[in-house]
């Protein structure tokens, strides 16, 4: 009998165990599609990014012109640039939905997988931030200045740290050069860490909407979920093409069409939409160090979620109180996103402060209380 290469070849065997014969719960829903969509986003961003890097010049006097050159003179350069810029937005949409799924269905109980996922989120945010600086437009320059300046709030070493990051006494050529180097490097680190994320996931197997062990009812990943993933890819790529071809600048800031000018500050400095919720939390505290700590806490709080799980059930499927809180949290994050895009004036200041307070209140206090109440109501 001939050897089955798929199951015996050292490399093919690994691929087979992860993508073909992987035992998968039979009832996972569309919310489990976003992991593979993130993989597609990463591959697409690395591909388009590589093509852009071939024509981009990381120098303050040439960066803005080189991006214009890509859009005007390079074959399909406009398309590559639009796919890359809007691909970042889709990357964040997918990762936020992926995290939301993890929160709702208790996937965070796979602690290693969850913690690596949070590190991946932080790396993605860093990559997007340094990437936004590269076109060297007004918002690129001032965004870099404002956000890197936050490190100066760190006591004792802050100012030294900022000047070390800048490579001088302000955001200038050395800053742009190193940001380009980091923007090129980080996606490959993300790809490596994604494999670790998957390795830990495949140790325990996927969670499912009921939050119960599914060992008794597993089906092979291929063809059932491979075809479902391909449908997800098609839908996402259609939406991305729609955005990149018809309204490529919808999510961008018009200010970034002006070349960077250190002598003229834009009236409203704000990051891309996917950072606005964190930016609103940062702005809601009228103290530099306090704001920076709140900004860091807004993401790092996710590390505490598995420790605060007090329910006897894993998923929120049969927990109405927790469901109400979950959707309140989603609404809260949308409010923060909106407030982050508004100027710092009444009533946005107080709305931002209330939304920031309730963000931490729901995650750190109300979720555990609701879980304990639900246990009592069900006499668990």
UniProtKB/Swiss-Prot annotation:
GO terms for biological process: mitochondrial electron transport, ubiquinol to cytochrome c. A ubiquinone binds at residue 202. CDD domains: cytochrome_b_C, Cytochrome_b_N. The chain crosses the membrane at residues 34-54, 78-99, 114-134, 179-199, 227-247, 289-309, 321-341, 348-368. One of its GO terms (cellular component) is mitochondrial inner membrane. It is a multi-pass membrane protein. Heme b b566 binds at residues 98, 197. InterPro entries: Cyt_b/b6_C (IPR005798), Cyt_b/b6_C_sf (IPR036150), Cyt_b/b6_N (IPR005797), Cytb/b6-like_sf (IPR027387), Cytochrome_b (IPR030689), Cytochrome_b_C_euk/bac (IPR048260), Cytochrome_b_N_euk/bac (IPR048259), Di-haem_cyt_TM (IPR016174). Its cofactor is heme b. Gene3D superfamilies: Cytochrome Bc1 Complex, Chain C. Component of the ubiquinol-cytochrome c reductase complex (complex III or cytochrome b-c1 complex) that is part of the mitochondrial respiratory chain. The b-c1 complex mediates electron transfer from ubiquinol to cytochrome c. Contributes to the generation of a proton gradient across the mitochondrial membrane that is then used for ATP synthesis. Heme 1 (or BL or b562) is low-potential and absorbs at about 562 nm, and heme 2 (or BH or b566) is high-potential and absorbs at about 566 nm. The cytochrome bc1 complex contains 11 subunits: 3 respiratory subunits (MT-CYB, CYC1 and UQCRFS1), 2 core proteins (UQCRC1 and UQCRC2) and 6 low-molecular weight proteins (UQCRH/QCR6, UQCRB/QCR7, UQCRQ/QCR8, UQCR10/QCR9, UQCR11/QCR10 and a cleavage product of UQCRFS1). This cytochrome bc1 complex then forms a dimer. This is Cytochrome b. It comes from Lanius ludovicianus. The lineage of its organism: Eukaryota, Metazoa, Chordata, Craniata, Vertebrata.
């Amino acid at each position: 009998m001939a050897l089955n290469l798929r199951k015996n070849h050292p490399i093919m065997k690994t691929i087979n165990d992860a993508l073909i014969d992987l035992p998968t719960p039979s009832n996972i829903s569309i919310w489990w599609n976003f992991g593979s969509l993130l993989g597609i986003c990463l591959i697409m961003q690395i591909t388009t990014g590589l093509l852009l890097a071939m024509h981009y010049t990381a120098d303050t006097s040439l960066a803005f012109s080189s991006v214009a050159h890509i859009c005007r003179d390079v074959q399909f350069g406009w398309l590559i640039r639009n796919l890359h810029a809007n691909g970042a937005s889709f990357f964040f949409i997918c990762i936020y939905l992926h995290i939301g799924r993890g929160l709702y269905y208790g996937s965070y109980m796979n602690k290693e997988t969850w913690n690596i996922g949070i590190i991946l989120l932080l790396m993605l945010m860093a990559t997007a931030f340094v990437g936004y600086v590269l076109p060297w437009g007004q918002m690129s320059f001032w965004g870099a200045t404002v956000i890197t300046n936050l490190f100066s709030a760190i006591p004792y070493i802050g100012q030294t740290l900022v000047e070390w990051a800048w490579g001088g006494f302000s955001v200038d050529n050395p800053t742009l050069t190193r940001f380009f180097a980091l923007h090129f490097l980080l996606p490959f680190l993300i790809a490596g860490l994604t494999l670790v994320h998957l390795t830990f996931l495949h140790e325990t197997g996927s969670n499912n909407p009921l939050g119960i062990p599914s060992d008794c009812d597993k089906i092979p990943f291929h063809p059932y979920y491979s075809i479902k993933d391909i449908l997800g890819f098609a839908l996402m790529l259609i939406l991305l093409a729609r955005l990149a071809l018809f309204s490529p600048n919808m999510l961008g800031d018009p200010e970034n069409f002006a070349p960077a000018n250190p002598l003229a500050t834009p009236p409203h400095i704000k990051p891309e939409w996917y950072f606005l919720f964190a930016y609103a939390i940062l702005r809601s505290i009228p103290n530099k160090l306090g704001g920076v700590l709140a900004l860091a806490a807004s993401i790092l709080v996710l590390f505490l979620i598995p420790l605060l799980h007090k329910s006897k059930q894993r998923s929120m499927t049969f927990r109405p109180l927790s469901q109400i809180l979950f959707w309140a949290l989603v609404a809260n994050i949308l409010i923060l996103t909106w407030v982050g895009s508004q100027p710092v004036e009444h009533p946005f200041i107080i709305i931002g402060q209330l939304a920031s307070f309730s963000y931490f209140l729901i995650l750190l206090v109300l979720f555990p209380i609701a879980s304990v109440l639900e246990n009592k109501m069900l006499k668990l």
